[in-house]
Amino acid sequence: MKTILQIEDNFANRRLVERVLEPFAYRLLHASDGQSGIDTALQESPDLILLDMGLPDMDGQTLVSILRETPALAKVPIVALTAWPESIAGEMAIRYGCDGCITKPINVAEFGRQIEAYLAR
């Protein structure tokens, strides 16, 4: 079973991702801030990290840098979940070190397929 860590401070967004991914039988973990996201990632070794780029304690760029500089986590795919405009979201996510980007509000019909594609890499 694949493990996904969602680092997201907004409860409604966490619940939405949980509901959308439920049929896929992933093990879904949650962290509500950057530091607990790092701690959870180190303890659980997720197969994918879904990262809100606007966390209250740490900006997304800083968090991605920390994850990438941590040997045990450096190769874990990171997908930004962001409210940035779609026209710049992908470019900004890649510039910050993410493997990809999904814009909010998420397209429920596409989200599961997108996650499966990132996990298949």
PLM regions: where:
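C-terminal output helix
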Residues: 15, 106-115
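Active-site beta3 strand of CheY-like receiver
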Residues: 44-50, 55
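Two-component/phosphorelay signaling modules centered on CheY-like receiver
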Residues: 11-29, 96
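Conserved acidic carboxylate
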Residues: 8
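The feature encodes the CheY-like receiver
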Residues: 56, 74, 86
